[in-house]
A protein has these predicted regions:
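Intrinsic disorder/low-complexity segments enriched in polar/small residues
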Residues: 4, 14-20, 43-45
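C-terminal edge-of-domain segments
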Residues: 35-46
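Short amphipathic
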Residues: 1-9
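A short, charged, amphipathic alpha-helix used as a generic interaction element across diverse proteins
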Residues: 9-33
Length: 46
């Protein structure tokens, strides 16, 4: 398994990044982190 962290200013931008990432990799799970200034997603993929 591989892991990646995606970071964006808004949840909408993060979702777009994740959709693009998902087209390239077989994503097994995602954990979202939402902070006042930015959002992040920890992605595990094969």
């Amino acid at each position: 398994m591989n892991k990646a962290v995606l970071v964006a200013d808004t949840i909408f931008e993060l979702t777009e990044q994740l959709e693009h990432f998902h087209t390239l990799h077989n994503v097994t799970y995602v954990v979202y982190y939402v902070f006042p200034d930015y959002c992040a997603a920890e992605v595990q993929y094969k």
